[in-house]
Amino acid sequence: FLFNEFDNIYVSFSGGKDSGVLLNLCIQYIREHNLDRKIGVYHMDYEAQYQMTTEYVEQTFRENQDILEIYHVCVPFKVVTCASMFQTYWRPWDESMHAHWVRPMPKNCYKKEDFPFYNEEMWDYTFQTSFASWYHKKHDAVRTCCLVGIRTQESLDRWRTIHGNNRLNSYHNLMWTRRLGYDLYNAYPIYD
């Protein structure tokens, strides 16, 4: 359904279980149906993440680079933190803190300079929404869909995304879709 309705599709891939299953289902679908297209993959690299997550993301990219258009994003957007009594946010890949980075910045990643919409006051989820619009325009797409795998039990906002009764902003009244902008949608085809 989604590959017929949207000419431009990308997966928001954290490296976790839900987004990993979703991305692998898309990869499998593209390969089994011999689709002559690539699928975008958006990975927000938070710098301080589990080593096995980083290894899984890198392996997935490496093994499927023939059909993936990879956006490995290493940008110093603001991220909420509860690990400090002195800071309300932190910034992954903050150049002013380079000496304290948890690990080296990955090669071939996208940096703040690659995104004309980026500004220093931007939070991670604001960046994500702006990325969707930028990606849609970059591809001169008719209709763009970002595929997201979520755990609805993790927060009330996530649960409402799927089970809420706001259908005005859905695609063809499908409860697992949300309109982000003109011809720009998020879809949550798998959720638990």
Please identify what each model-predicted range represents:
Residues 1-191:
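ATP-dependent adenylation/nucleotidyltransferase module used to activate substrates
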